[in-house]
């Protein structure tokens, strides 16, 4: 078993002026951390796009258990592909980093949703993600122009199309979206990736992945990066560490 010989703080500056830190100590740990809600953290990772620039994945791989990589945004146009998609996924596959995928949704119509699903499928051809393919719901134009029922229908089109092609699927959104727009029980059919940039989620629903901040710093990446915690089965047998959330 390969060990990570590291001790690093992934700092997340919060809007309140404080910071949360995910600490990954050098020693192997017997058990994962348990948060107040009882969830067990079994992996710390990042989500990245072209906005992180060129990533030194050989370095970054030593500090993460997984990655979630943007494939693109909106409808199936090559101009809307993420420019770092190919290199980022190739690096994860070369280094054995478990990864998931997300597509930033702009869908306003059923036709848009079908095109976004086609966009993801085109870019997934030949790729082997171990984690879900997520539809990213954060664009304000969706809430401004679509009813809750329409959003659900668009998400269903995307997710069912990807599932039919053999992929695990999920939905990304922040806590406000989950509690106001995405509160239909149908969403329980898909993996849930929750964004709350704070030391606690304040969310009573279930979720498999928590995006804790967008201001993390990690070796191998020059820009700020989103930090994510995952719950459930361990993703990398060679990464067995205790994860602790603290405030500073």
Name what the model sees in each region:
Residues 24-58, 185-248:
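Functionally critical loop-and-helix segments that line ligand-binding/catalytic clefts
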Residues 121-135, 139-141, 182-207:
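Structural recognition of alpha->loop->beta junctions
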Residues 31, 36-166:
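Substrate-binding cleft of extracellular glycoside hydrolase catalytic domains
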Residues 10-15:
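Hydrophobic core
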Residues 1-5:
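Positively charged n-region of N-terminal signal peptides that target proteins for export
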Residues 74-78, 174-177, 185:
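Peptidoglycan cell-wall recognition and remodeling modules
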Residues 162-179:
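Aromatic-lined carbohydrate-recognition surfaces of secreted/lumenal glycan-active proteins
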Residues 16-26:
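C-terminal region of N-terminal signal peptides and the immediate post-cleavage residues
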């Amino acid at each position: 078993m390969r060990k990570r010989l590291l001790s690093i703080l992934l700092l997340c500056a919060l809007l309140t002026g404080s910071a949360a830190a995910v600490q990954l100590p050098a020693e192997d740990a017997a058990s994962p951390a348990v948060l107040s809600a009882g969830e067990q953290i079994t992996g710390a990772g990042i989500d990245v796009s072209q906005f992180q620039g060129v990533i030194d994945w050989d370095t970054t791989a030593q500090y993460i258990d997984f990655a979630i990589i943007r494939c693109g945004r909106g409808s199936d146009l090559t101009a809307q592909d993420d420019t770092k998609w190919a290199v980022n996924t190739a690096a994860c596959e070369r280094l054995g980093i478990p990864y998931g995928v997300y597509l930033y949704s702009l869908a306003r119509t059923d036709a848009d949703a079908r095109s976004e699903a086609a966009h993801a499928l085109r870019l997934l051809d030949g790729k082997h993600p171990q984690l879900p393919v997520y539809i990213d719901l954060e664009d304000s134009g969706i809430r401004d122009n679509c009813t809750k029922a329409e959003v659900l229908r668009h998400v269903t089109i995307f997710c069912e199309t990807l599932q039919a092609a053999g992929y695990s699927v999920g939905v990304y959104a922040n806590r406000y979206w989950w509690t106001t727009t995405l509160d239909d029980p149908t969403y329980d059919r898909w993996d849930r990736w929750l964004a709350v940039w704070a030391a606690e989620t304040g969310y009573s629903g279930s979720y498999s992945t928590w995006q804790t901040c967008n201001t993390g710093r990690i070796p191998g990446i020059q820009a700020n990066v989103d930090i994510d915690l995952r719950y459930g089965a361990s993703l990398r047998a060679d990464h067995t560490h205790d994860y602790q959330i603290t405030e500073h």
